[in-house]
Swiss-Prot record:
Phenotype when the gene is knocked out: Mutant mice exhibit increased bone density, due to diminished bone resorption, including following parathyroid hormone treatment. This phenotype is due to defective terminal osteoclast differentiation. They also show a delayed wound repair program, characterized by a deficit in macrophage emigration to the wound, a reduced myofibroblast-dependent wound contraction and a diminished neovascularization in the restoration tissue.
Highest taxon of source: Eukaryota
Xref: Gene3D superfamilies: 3.30.60.20, Calponin-like domain, Dbl homology (DH) domain, Pleckstrin-homology domain (PH domain)/Phosphotyrosine-binding domain (PTB), SH2 domain, SH3 Domains
PROSITE patterns given in the database record: CH, DH_1, DH_2, PH_DOMAIN, SH2, SH3, ZF_DAG_PE_1, ZF_DAG_PE_2
One Gene Ontology biological process: positive regulation of phosphatidylinositol 3-kinase/protein kinase B signal transduction
Native species: Mus musculus (Mouse)
Record protein name field: Guanine nucleotide exchange factor VAV3
Lineage of producing organism: Eukaryota, Metazoa, Chordata, Craniata, Vertebrata
Amino acid sequence: MEPWKQCAQWLIHSKVLPPNHRVTWDSAQVFDLAQTLRDGVLLCQLLNNLRPHSINLKEINLRPQMSQFLCLKNIRTFLAACCDTFGMRKSELFEAFDLFDVRDFGKVIETLSRLSRTPIALATGIRPFPTEESINDEDIYKGLPDLIDETRVEDEEDLYDCVYGEDEGGEVYEDLMKAEEAQQPKSQENDIRSCCLAEIRQTEEKYTETLESIEKYFMAPLKRFLTAAEFDSVFINIPDLVKVHRSLMQEIHDSIVNKDDQNLYQVFINYKERLVIYGQYCSGVESAISNLDYISKTKEDVKLKLEECSKRANNGKFTLRDLLVVPMQRVLKYHLLLQELVKHTHDPMEKANLKLALDAMKDLAQYVNEVKRDNETLREIKQFQLSIENLNQPVLLFGRPQGDGEIRITTLDKHTKQERHIFLFDLAVIVCKRKGDNYEMKEIIDLQQYKIANNPTTDKENKKWSYGFYLIHTQGQNGLEFYCKTKDLKKKWLEQFEMALSNIRPDYADSNFHDFKMHTFTRVTSCRVCQMLLRGTFYQGYLCFKCGAKAHKECLGRVDNCGRVNSVEQGPFKPPEKRTNGLRRASRQVDPGLPKMQVIRNYTGTPAPGLHEGPPLHIQAGDTVELLRGDAHSVFWQGRNLASGEVGFFPSDAVKPSPCVPKPVDYSCQPWYAGPMERLQAETELINRVNSTYLVRHRTKESGEYAISIKYNNEAKHIKILTRDGFFHIAENRKFKSLMELVEYYKHHSLKEGFRTLDTTLQFPYKEPEQPAGQRGNRTGNSLLSPKVLGIAIARYDFCARDMRELSLLKGDMVKIYTKMSANGWWRGEVNGRVGWFPSTYVEEDE
């Protein structure tokens, strides 16, 4: 048996790889093992399996997504621990790039073989390898670097289950919440629904007791042993949690015991706003535990006091460290408890009301999960900051990381290619030169000033580092050209740049006269449109710098008319002052959600508005006015004439509400949508692609019209999509309610229904990477068989991806679920051929 196969068996026995992993298949190749180990995550877990706590998993990047920087950091962490903990010599180790670039995978196998023979590894009782004579054929490793370059990496999510394990603190939580079944009266009414209600009430009582016990048995006694800063860093906002839960517990008890749970749904809806303080707690709990560990190690008196407190609180069963994780567990249980109650509630009105409460608690859970997720991202950002020399600006200001890796760059007026490592964020690109394990910052590119464009002519060269695309300055300054190692990497970089630019300038950012920009909200904030919380700790959503409206990316197209013009040029939004009128009630500011108004009679300024109001707005019958201010008692309203752009006051009886306009649909996240594009540009995009590659573009000459461009018989063909009476069609005999529906239909039915000479379906969206012909249906079939479908869910809300790992959803989408990661509230699934992560609270599983 070849050494790499024996290595794979050793990894399985070490419980790092599952027994049915693809490296055990008859079709397995050494490439499969190399690709599995490349990110360093499983190697770090291997050391922890051989000796627990060899590596602190919080210090590695558990989902590096093939970021070169993060993968190399993981690999170097593994190599350092091999020396420091396992006593291996540096000469016995491979170098980080031997694995990441698989330039010497034979050396990697050799290192793992030596590791298997260290005293620590042998003490586990697992046989080292090789266990038999084998021929070490170096030739099998030679083609790996090219194969890695040519193969698009997908996540093997099931592999990481062993790394994540159970939710931290889960067992402690379950132990604390155990119902005392012996005390439960047994009666016929004690049905499943009654059990659900009893569980909600009892667990809330027990949880409140746990919080009170932390306050009474730990906080009070430790106050004189800790400094004020230490005290606050360990206990965060637990006193606030105690107050909220004492009150919540009483209201839940009152509703279930005294009111037959008729108002239970309202209790949870009312408390959602008060429970967002968990964002602060969950942001700080990891640091709290680290600080507690450090204080315990450095202060003997505190260590002894903690042991004493634990004995008084619960006979020493749970330490303070155990108990600090419980609040994070509890806040993520409310929606699960309500979900079970909804399932066993049959009265239609009660069920509908409880679903409102369930939505509120799902929103809260997603908010908390995103805070946790952002904390992981902030750790990554901190690592970037510490590893880049000459970087004086906080990387945090550049948004979330989209990717990093090696690239070659030229300015458009020079032709010398420079080897660089770039870090791409939402708002900027940090261009660096590699210096050993660190990087030297050479330039920061502000992406707000740039757009990207493909350079398809470079694809014809068909050699490494020849695949280029442009970064063009929007104000005409000198641009850049980036060159990628392979065509597939170029496609990946283009997607990542497009995602970053779509975060900076999303569709509908300026719709209805708004001026939306990415923004970090320092307070917990809800979306103007869907009323759900803006998620995370930084750059959570978008702020209109004119009227102060706040929204999710996916909701921008549905924010109603902008309430003010030029009210926020700089700095934070300030709400407009209310005007008062001595002759009538003080007018209130109209919610910007009021509809546009249609003018039904001319007004040229007579009679004039009151002196306290402002200039008249000249309008003519048929004009459309955007309402800015007014109320039912006002004779004059303020508005903007959409024809002239002028703002002023007009008689309220001169207008009537305009017909409702359907919400615009955002197709930007679809792999086939190209946005506004001319025919020639579409032909350029398709010229070097395989037949049946297609895109859907917005026709720039005819507003609101779309066209399909598809490569057929080596030529680009264009099909106009007709819209009439709210339907889309390319053939008169078949009409569709949406563009999405039309595209989905022609993925499975030939276009010859409308065009006899076009006998093809829509097969390859132009944004998706094209696989080399030799590998199409071969390598992917070997490495990435269709994952097991765990279930089907329906999207309840729109969701717009923020990076390439995420999966955009439109309300009503049918989602195949592949992975459920309860640890962070995100699931992995597929919609219309696209695979990625999405918030589990945005979908509802089919029962």
